[in-house]
Design a protein with these regions (language model features):
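Multipass alpha-helical transmembrane domains of eukaryotic endomembrane proteins
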Residues: 150, 154-266, 285-299
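Membrane-interfacial loop-to-transmembrane-helix junctions in polytopic alpha-helical membrane proteins
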Residues: 7-14, 43, 88-95, 99, ...
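Cytosolic, intrinsically disordered low-complexity tails and loops
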Residues: 1, 299-322
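N-terminal signal-anchor/initial transmembrane insertion module
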Residues: 1-147, 291, 322
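Intrinsically disordered, low-complexity regulatory regions of eukaryotic regulatory proteins
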Residues: 17, 177-180, 202, 308-316
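Small-residue-rich transmembrane alpha-helices that serve as helix-helix interface/gating elements
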Residues: 271-283
């Protein structure tokens, strides 16, 4: 049993090493390319080269996190069956593998800072649509964030291929990947050479802010995964509600509203993601209503138990007679 579990751990270590390699390649490619855009538009200033230092620290942090992930549960369970068994419980607040969502938070904030600078300094707006390193190439570079999220999720679990845990993780990864790609497409509204639109300054800021918020939001999904041990335990209801509410109010609803506004008043081409926003709103509301009712019911039950407990503490003899 120990030998079989050791082989399983060896195969998992090989897969983890491959994930680390691909993750580092993506981080280096994305970070250095965005740095190239910033440095090229600000030639003569040495300060912009310090972005490479930030990319290096982010890459090293991600590599350390991926290398820190222990062997799969099968190997740990085999050792505990032969040795002294003890339950490995996650931290009640930080959850399992807290550095995973911390690394995404640092990475996404660094990405958001670069994206904001690219658009606030008019670097992205001046790119040619058909140039080799133009608009489409910049979109592809920013969209690499979806690959980073996918590798972070895949590198922190060992779910069986046909298990409910694997189904849940695959669904979450796919949904979050589409959300990130939707944000990149939404940023495309800020390229005047491609859209042939001149947005007002408040609308331009709204598009940029909403897109950047959606780059940070997957950190909450990773935090939710850490709390439920990547699908092994029931998912916290409060976090589920918060995640769905934020997606409705900060992603699907405003994205749909702005796209419909530009389509109706300016004749802008309709993005296929407008259908995704409609489906996201419908599915989000349909899933949110029963969860919200359950959450309110649990809150009322907790309040009732607290009132009963207070009454027992005040007059336990009277309650016993009743």
């Amino acid at each position: 049993m120990r030998a079989m579990a050791a082989r399983c751990c060896s195969a998992s270590s090989l897969a983890t090493a491959l994930d680390v390699l691909v993750l580092l390649v993506v981080l280096v490619f994305q970070g250095s390319t965005l740095d190239f855009y910033l440095i090229r538009s600000n030639e003569g200033s040495v300060a912009w080269y310090f972005w490479f230092l930030a990319d290096f620290l982010s890459g090293e942090f991600s590599r350390a996190i991926q290398s820190w992930v222990p062997c799969p549960p099968a190997f740990v369970q085999a050792q505990r069956e032969e040795d002294a068994p003890q339950e490995d419980c996650p931290h009640p607040v930080w959850g399992r593998f807290p550095l995973c969502y911390v690394s995404w938070l640092l990475y996404s904030l660094l990405l958001v800072a670069k994206v904001v600078l690219l658009f606030r300094l008019d670097v992205a707006q001046l790119l040619e649509e058909n140039a080799r390193y133009g608009v489409q190439f910049l979109k592809a570079v920013v969209a690499a964030a979806a690959v980073v999220f996918l590798l972070l999720v895949e590198g922190h679990h060992d779910a069986a291929s046909q298990s409910e845990q694997r189904t849940y993780l695959r669904s979450l990864s796919t949904g979050t990947t589409f959300e990130l790609l939707d944000s990149v497409t939404f940023l495309g509204l800020l390229f005047p050479n491609e859209t042939h639109l001149t947005l007002t300054y408040p609308l331009e800021n709204a598009v940029l802010a909403l897109a950047c918020v959606n780059f940070v939001l997957p950190g909450l999904a990773l935090f939710k995964l850490s709390q439920c041990e990547y699908g092994l335990r029931p998912r916290p209801l409060g976090l589920k509600l918060l995640y769905k509410l934020l997606h409705l109010s900060l992603v699907n609803v405003p994205y749909l509203a702005i796209r419909v506004y530009l389509w109706g008043f300016f004749g802008h081409d309709v993005s296929l993601f407008i259908v995704k926003n409609l489906l996201g709103i419908y599915a989000g509301i349909r899933a949110l209503v029963p969860d919200l009712r359950l959450y309110c019911f649990l809150l009322s039950e907790r309040g009732a138990r607290k009132r009963v407990g207070d009454a027992e503490a005040r007059d336990p003899i009277e309650l016993k007679v009743m």
